[in-house]
Amino acid sequence: MKAVALPIQPPYPVMDAELVGELPRGREWQYEPKWDGFRCLAFRNGETVELQSKSGKPLARYFPDVVAMLKSLSARRFVIDSELVIPVDGGTSFEELQLRLHPAASRVRKLADAHPAVMIAFDLLVDASGRSLAAKPLKDRRKALERFHADFAKDVKRLRLSPATTNIKQALEWLRRAGNSLDGIVAKRLDLGYRSGDRTGMVKYKVIRSADCVVGGFRYLEGTKLVGSLLLGLYGEDGLLHHVGFTSSIRDEDRKALTARLVKLRRPPGFTGRAPGGPSRWSTERTGEWEPLKQVLVVEVAYDQFTGGRFRHGTKFLRWRPDKAPSQCKFDQVERRSPGPEAIPVRLR
């Protein structure tokens, strides 16, 4: 990244959030939607614009549309903390964001033209006068961000102000009405400054969803003959069973009995549609040999996101579902529901 003559320089560690099982309550907390996108710090000084990822890596080459949008603002100095999302079919698409991470500039430009990204701003670290706000409490930074947006981006469709509230009921209502389109809720202490590289005073509550899946196969635990992971499938409209992910959260004391049960059910093909081992940008499991199973077992798993036809991360085993027919395990239970225009108070198009 280029040097930027501002009080805050890239790479700058972002303030991160601690994962919690329940949102904190109290008027000292501000609640915001947890968008399903790419965290992005945006730096501008004159004609120099840099975008930084959560991990500190440069993003500008992958989002030329965002760089151009920021250069179009009359404010010539600022640092904004934000989330990049790509609106598709009334919702947002994490898969489209992933496609931007391509080495060919021509491909990136084509993707940007087809699906421009939107920046959802939720913090202002350097204002238009070039003054650092990082040490100021969030309540003051939020007011400054709202003034900045009103003065410089009110009519800019691809720079949106993330909604915020001190009413926890309102925050939970966003989750309820937005369906699967939000990743959760973030809560921030209003009295604290921006804690770069720290998790103090900022927590995230993630939505955990569940789905019933067919066990189409399994993999052995490395170096053993005990089951290591169950391979999960869902039936598509084509009537085929497609591999959508895995769960490896099996208790050690259950592995021997479960392995014996699964071995008796070994039968190809296991998956009649998309099978394990194919390319996937979400895969975190090691590809390799797997054992196909007769399509009779149904398991309920917990997951955070389902994108691009599969679970983005490994799922958590919840329970067996002997009461559920495999044919009932379809994609409709995991498809992302797009929010209506009233679901959350920010329009992406």
Positions of PLM-derived features:
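Catalytic cores of nucleic-acid ligases and guanylyltransferases
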Residues: 1-349
